[in-house]
Swiss-Prot record:
Family: Belongs to the G-protein coupled receptor 1 family.
Keyword annotations of the record: Cell membrane, Disulfide bond, G-protein coupled receptor, Glycoprotein, Lipoprotein, Membrane, Palmitate, Receptor, Transducer, Transmembrane, Transmembrane helix
Gene Ontology biological-process entries: positive regulation of flagellated sperm motility; regulation of uterine smooth muscle contraction
Positions annotated as glycosylated: 11, 18-19
Protein name: Substance-K receptor
Disulfide bonds: 106-181
Subcellular location: Cell membrane
InterPro entries tied to this protein: GPCR_Rhodpsn, GPCR_Rhodpsn_7TM, Neurokn_rcpt, NK2_rcpt
Function: This is a receptor for the tachykinin neuropeptide substance K (neurokinin A). It is associated with G proteins that activate a phosphatidylinositol-calcium second messenger system.
Topology, Cytoplasmic side: 57-69, 130-149, 219-251, 311-384
Topological region Extracellular: 1-32, 91-107, 171-196, 273-290
Amino acid sequence: MGAHAIVTDANISSSLENNTTGITAFSMPGWQLALWATAYLVLVLVAVTGNATVIWIILAHQRMRTVTNYFIVNLALADLCMAAFNAAFNFVYASHNIWYFGRAFCHFQNLFPITAMFVSIYSMTAIAADRYVAIVHPFQPRLSAPGTRAVIAGIWLLALALAFPQCFYSTITMDQGATKCVVVWPEDNGSKMLLLYHLVVIALIYVLPLLVMLLAYSVIGLTLWRREVPRHQVHGASLRHLRAKKKFVKTMVLVVVTFAICWLPYHFYFILGSFQEDIYYHKFIQQVYLALFWLAMSSTMYNPIIYCCLNHRFRSGFRLAFRCCPWVTPTEEDKIELTHTPSLSARINRCHTKETFFMAGETALSPATNGQARGPQDGLPDEP
């Protein structure tokens, strides 16, 4: 995360300073800086626009307000904030090796990246747990609306608690006329505390939740692919329901795998640096770090693209959101897809199914349901 980058870059930067004030061993040619700036600008624009659109699609349409989709909103909000408040500012710091943004933002920058990443991955974990209950144990009670809000609030509180130590020990220092945002651990065991903190953070916001999701989606996959549709229903709603659930599993597995791939090199970078600090003294490490940081931050922009490509309701939502663009032409079906309420006959035909489905397949939470999620959304389409 960006906060880790600040710790490392700031703590080692003074040893890389040249004798000339304002010039560091990390200085790069203007054309190279322009290329990196363009890459990061594209990342931030795509991530902020895409995740803001996902949030709008869900919150602006009653049919999309489901347990799973509220966790999707939480994930999108964390990714949006990560791109807006971490990617851009940390790029400026890493490329110039000077902190321009003041003491208060130094504390924030050492608090928020860990918080946002924790919220992102545990929102994915909550989705996996919710789908596990819905598919593997379909007759067990689902999360209520208050329960969903409580889980989301709990995720944010735990995330802030995990990030607090780094925020607490962050400070502003001056090094040969250059301002640095650094994390100063207690002097007695500073290096040991830094290593321990890195390992704990990586375990809690990467290894543990990925293992939980691997187990959950493995069980979900086995359950779905072993399930058979009765012969007399091979062309009916049951087959569509099964296909929708399988497509959901593929979608969320793609989201999780993308996240894991984007962040793995970045975490490995800091684990290696904790044991071999001399790697930070090489001039090329700035380019390595900028590449790894871009890859990690790029995880914030892929989810909206995945939703749009694999989920037809989100495709409809994106068409409506960008209808002002000359190359985007939303249809009446796109509007119906997000607002249509099926007929009573369709409800009766589907009321026997207890399970709920990703994005399109759940009943939207409302006061009328007394806060308890019910069965499947009426009018479940062929895909989730």
